[in-house]
Amino acid sequence: MKTLPLVLAVVAFVYLDLAHTLKCRSGNVCILGDDCSEGENVCFQRKNGTGVFGMRVVRGCAASCPSPIGGEEVSCCSTDNCNNSFSRFF
């Protein structure tokens, strides 16, 4: 009878994702994805026209949505791998 609570606790630990880590696309290639660090709850995508081929895109994790610098456009979202080119942003 004493083992029942222990078994239930183990089952709950195995099947519940108690510490979900956000996953975001990173770098300038949208195929790669990384686990965000603790406290980083937002995926971002920065776009500007200063790249070699006219458009530079950088993606990654952040604690909050970064502010745009210069003429860049910044988009943020908060679900796994949501910062790819085809996602909706807020």
UniProtKB/Swiss-Prot annotation:
Keyword Disulfide bond (UniProt): yes
Family: Belongs to the three-finger toxin family. Ancestral subfamily.
Cleavable signal peptide: 1-21
Protein name (record): Toxin 3FTx-Psa1
Gene Ontology cellular component terms for the protein in this record: extracellular region
Lineage per the UniProt record: Eukaryota, Metazoa, Chordata, Craniata, Vertebrata
Listed CDD domains: TFP_snake_toxin
KW Endoplasmic reticulum (keyword) present: no
